[in-house]
């Protein structure tokens, strides 16, 4: 008798993706983040769904509806904090996942990598719009500042901003459409994640050595299914520690003040996971230049496959490139710190140097290091 999972049209798809999938025998814990991102997305969709049952996207009642969720709805406070901190967890996993991709040369699977970049943009857009919904001070002013950046686009800029706002300022129409987009985008992200997985399974997973593993494959289940399960348990333990003990550690106190268009907060800043890009934006003393640098800071990921000069795929045996990779990580941490600081000396110059270094490492130093390492292997 044939096994049902191998013949049933639906189960066959699941079987090929999660059960009988041939996987390299040596992939490490860094390969867990794909499944962890899936867990994060499910948490966000479920908590978001329950929040939307009680939330009202209206400037007059949005703030009080969030307050009502936290005070009056059964476990509303838990759902709200899970959703807010779930976003942070999502980005932690996302950045580690991208870092893994850069370190081990996974970007050489170009289709998978490019869909990953689109996914990153979608997740960033979703998170930004979600931050606007509680209609606190930082929600309102964050929305005003970030949407206003589009006015730097020549000719169509000002009209484009008013079109997005649905008026002459961030108001009821803006909040309403942001809620609509914030609700629909996670489902688009889920669909894109399926495409991401589809392209990955065309080639099979990369591995830490960056070499072909066709001769040494093991079935995904039970080996990696249990490994992913362990990762998920560890992730949830970390997640609930933050949610239950430090729920406001990653948020901004200004967002507990209702939005007031007549009172600007002293320091307008986005959530921590956007601070590196915000620092790059602010490091250029020109509006259009800053916006271009902001977009390029993420879009530069698309250049990784083109700038790969080494004969080896992974950084496993490339000490110069390894040093540059960790310099890049340190640089991003410095940019994150600078993004949360006021625009005054010495933070301005630190931000400018860190921004220049960020682009230099990716566009210049890493490709040169690859060529040097090729020469070293010949000697």
UniProtKB/Swiss-Prot annotation:
Positions bound to heme b b562: 83, 182
Subcellular compartments: Mitochondrion inner membrane
Record-linked InterPro entries: Cyt_b/b6_C, Cyt_b/b6_C_sf, Cyt_b/b6_N, Cytb/b6-like_sf, Cytochrome_b, Cytochrome_b_C_euk/bac, Cytochrome_b_N_euk/bac, Di-haem_cyt_TM
Record-listed heme b b566 binding positions: 97, 196
Keyword Mitochondrion in annotation: yes
Cofactor note: Binds 2 heme b groups non-covalently.
Database matches in SUPFAM superfamilies: a domain/subunit of cytochrome bc1 complex (Ubiquinol-cytochrome c reductase) (SSF81648), Transmembrane di-heme cytochromes (SSF81342)
Gene Ontology terms: cellular component: mitochondrial inner membrane; respiratory chain complex III
SUBUNIT field: The cytochrome bc1 complex contains 11 subunits: 3 respiratory subunits (MT-CYB, CYC1 and UQCRFS1), 2 core proteins (UQCRC1 and UQCRC2) and 6 low-molecular weight proteins (UQCRH/QCR6, UQCRB/QCR7, UQCRQ/QCR8, UQCR10/QCR9, UQCR11/QCR10 and a cleavage product of UQCRFS1). This cytochrome bc1 complex then forms a dimer.
Protein family membership: Belongs to the cytochrome b family.
Its job: Component of the ubiquinol-cytochrome c reductase complex (complex III or cytochrome b-c1 complex) that is part of the mitochondrial respiratory chain. The b-c1 complex mediates electron transfer from ubiquinol to cytochrome c. Contributes to the generation of a proton gradient across the mitochondrial membrane that is then used for ATP synthesis.
Full protein name: Cytochrome b
């Amino acid at each position: 008798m044939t096994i049902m999972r191998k013949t049933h049209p639906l189960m066959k798809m699941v079987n090929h993706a999660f059960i009988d999938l041939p996987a390299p025998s040596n992939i490490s814990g860094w390969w867990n983040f794909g499944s962890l991102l899936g867990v994060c997305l499910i948490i966000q969709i479920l908590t978001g769904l329950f929040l939307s049952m009680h939330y009202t996207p209206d400037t007059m009642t949005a703030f009080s509806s969030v307050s009502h969720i936290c005070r009056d709805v059964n476990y509303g406070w838990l759902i709200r904090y899970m959703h807010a901190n779930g976003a942070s967890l999502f980005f932690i996993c996302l950045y580690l996942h991208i870092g893994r991709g850069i370190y081990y040369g996974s970007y050489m699977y170009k289709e998978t990598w490019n869909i990953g970049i689109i996914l990153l943009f979608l997740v960033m857009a979703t998170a930004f719009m979600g931050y606007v919904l509680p209609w606190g001070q930082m929600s309102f002013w964050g929305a005003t500042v970030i949407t206003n950046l589009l006015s730097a686009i020549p000719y169509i800029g000002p009209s484009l901003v008013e079109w997005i706002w649905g008026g002459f300022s961030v108001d009821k129409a803006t909040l309403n459409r942001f809620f609509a987009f914030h609700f629909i985008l996670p489902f688009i992200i889920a669909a894109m994640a399926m495409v991401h997985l589809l392209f990955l399974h065309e080639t099979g997973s990369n591995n830490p050595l960056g070499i072909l593993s066709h001769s040494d494959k093991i079935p995904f289940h039970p080996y990696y299914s249990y490994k992913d399960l362990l990762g998920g348990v560890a992730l949830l333990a970390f997640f609930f520690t933050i949610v239950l003990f430090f729920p406001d550690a990653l948020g901004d106190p200004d967002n507990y003040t209702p939005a007031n268009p007549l009172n600007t907060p002293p320091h307008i800043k986005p959530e921590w996971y956007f601070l590196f890009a915000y620092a790059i934006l602010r490091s250029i003393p020109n509006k259009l230049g800053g916006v271009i640098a902001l977009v390029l800071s993420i879009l530069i990921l698309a250049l990784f496959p083109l700038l790969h000069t080494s004969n080896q795929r992974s950084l496993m045996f490339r000490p110069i490139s390894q040093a540059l990779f960790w310099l890049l990580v340190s640089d991003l941490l410095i940019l994150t710190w600078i993004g949360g600081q006021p625009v005054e000396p010495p933070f301005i110059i630190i931000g400018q140097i860190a921004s220049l270094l960020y682009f230099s490492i990716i566009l210049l130093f890493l490709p040169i290091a690859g060529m040097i390492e090729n020469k070293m292997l010949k000697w």
